[in-house]
Amino acid sequence: MQQDYLSQQRFSALPLHPIVRGALAKKGFDFCTPIQALSLPISLNGRDVAGQAQTGTGKTMAFLTATFHHLLTHQDPNLKYPHPRALILAPTRELAVQISNDAEFLAKASGLKTALAYGGDGYDKQLQAIERGVDILIGTTGRVIDYVKQGVIGLDEIQVVVLDEADRMFDLGFIRDIRYLLRKCPAPQARLTMLFSATLSYKVRELAFEDMNEPEYIEIEPEQKTGHRIKEELFYPSNQDKMALLLTLMEDEWPERCIVFANTKHRCEEIWGYLAADGHRVGLLTGDVAQKKRLSLLKQFTDGDLDILVATDVAARGLHISDVTHVFNYDLPDDREDYVHRIGRTGRAGESGVSISFACEEYAMNLPAIEEYIGHSIPVSQYETEALLELPKPYRLKRAVPPQGHTRHRSYHAK
């Protein structure tokens, strides 16, 4: 992590439980990020926090540190706890899995057990893990409610509640589920509650007011909505040139880890077909992709076995992927906030990133609202039609496709 991204607050100077402090030091956590520096002095003191922070700012470690500290300092060694003592809710299963992975080193050091509860698959495996005993339950609202209604778990011993990406939970229609679960937990005054959201909108503040105990609000505002470490670039391609321009820029930029966004499932499939035919190691992430395949693709991408993900906004929500070097907006999004969410997947945690957008004939009308929202014009670049690569015959999903991890090679079939 870049030093200029960190604050002057050291973890070692915070009143942390010795086990948590030691685990953080062993993992290489020395200085806090700004959201950690602001939130931890509050949460470690047992007070509720409602924080505004984008993904990639260190908020996950902020609430995990506070959660493990609180459980370790509020446990009776003479008692056995048959039910979870902490509940961490996320809007998507992928984010829940990521949080669980991030918590592993703290769980190992402390002896506290974590378990996952998310829909899609793994029902019996998750159930077995919970029945073996769990201190910290991490999951999505639907599956957690299933287990509560079946009597598999009770929430009456919950000491910590975390709501991550609360604004996305609202967007996905989970607010009724959240309130159901919170009503099953002890009263707000009897637990520590932490809420994090990219925006502290009226509806998020209303939830905090009703279901938290006088939370302290903290906000980490980026210097600009799109992040000053992200290099933005805009092209005006014709519909005819658009795909060839994407392939040409892929050859020119040769991104180490890239996400290409499009507005529809059909367009994503088309992009995947051309990139795969051009020899790129590319995965497709749309709402139709099965849960096991989604997790497999995410692991391949994270491990470096895939270089490119082609995704819709809905399918990519909640994905926390480090070291993304490039984001391509093949289609400008209809929602201006989605532009910020998309390109915010690069340039995280102090690293630099590149965002390249296409203002084509179909979606150029979305550009004025986007530029008004981000507060600046996106620099425009030109291209020469004669220099664009010739399009290969695309792969089709209906046909047999090559393995997604086949060897990547450069294409030299320019016009």
UniProtKB/Swiss-Prot annotation:
The positions annotated for binding ATP are: A53, Q54, T55, G56, T57, G58, K59, T60
Where the record annotates domain Helicase C-terminal, the positions are 241-389
Q: Which InterPro entries does the entry link to?
A: DEAD/DEAH_box_helicase_dom, DEAD_box_RNA_helicase, Helicase_ATP-bd, Helicase_C-like, P-loop_NTPase, RNA-helicase_DEAD-box_CS, RNA_helicase_ATP-dep_RhlB, RNA_helicase_DEAD_Q_motif
Q: What is its EC number?
A: 3.6.4.13
Q: Which domain of life is it from?
A: Bacteria
Every Helicase ATP-binding domain range:
40-218
GO cellular component terms, semicolon-separated: cytosol
Keywords (alphabetical) are: ATP-binding, Cytoplasm, Helicase, Hydrolase, Nucleotide-binding, RNA-binding
Motif DEAD box boundaries = 164-167
Q: Which GO terms describe its biological process?
A: RNA catabolic process
Query: Which residue ranges does UniProt annotate as crossing the membrane?
Result: none
Stated family: Belongs to the DEAD box helicase family. RhlB subfamily.
> What does the subunit comment say?
Component of the RNA degradosome, which is a multiprotein complex involved in RNA processing and mRNA degradation.
Q: Which PANTHER family match?
A: ATP-DEPENDENT RNA HELICASE RHLB, ATP-DEPENDENT RNA HELICASE RHLE-RELATED
- Protein name, as recorded: ATP-dependent RNA helicase RhlB
> Which organism is the protein's source?
Haemophilus influenzae (strain ATCC 51907 / DSM 11121 / KW20 / Rd)
